[in-house]
Amino acid sequence: KCPIIFFCRNNGYAISTPTTEQYGGDGIGGKGIGYGIHVIRVDGNDLIAVYNATKAAREITEQNEPVLIEAMTYRLGHHSTSDDSSAYRCSEEVNTWYQKNNPIVRFRIILENKGWWNNEEDITYQKKIRKEIMEAFLHAEKIPKPNILSMFDDVYKEMPKILQEQRDELREHLNKYGKYYPMKNFEDS
């Protein structure tokens, strides 16, 4: 057995198909049990519960045992840029989840109830963080992207022949057609 934590964010959908139409049962946790893996199911929108579940999973891995954490949550956004989730779920459903089960909102309520946070602090902090994020974006845009061929590095201890061939084909392709790509945005090879 292996001391590993598998963390599944069960958001209720696989692209546009609800999990209720994908498999019997109410989640994938049972599959872990079938493979002899410890399973912890947790409310994925409860920050403290997720922390405690992860802590418990870590303790299990110290016994050289694998663990599957299934965090039950909801996907608020689209699956990808090619997905329009309004085609298979209504805005009321999404808004209800956002307003009632949003993990950030839920944790904020806990902090406010303890007197550790308030609306004024929240507004000030959001402005500060937004500024820091924009500064980080501007800084990152000035840094060249890693060398395109570096995507083949540090994947395997010894690179398989097929991967070496793919890397060589990409290198050859870029030598021939590199002028058609924004190679100036990448570090030199």
Spans of model-derived segments:
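Glycine-rich ThDP/TPP pyrophosphate-binding loop and its adjacent helix/strand module
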Residues: C2-K142
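Intrinsic disorder at enzyme termini
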Residues: I148, F152-S189
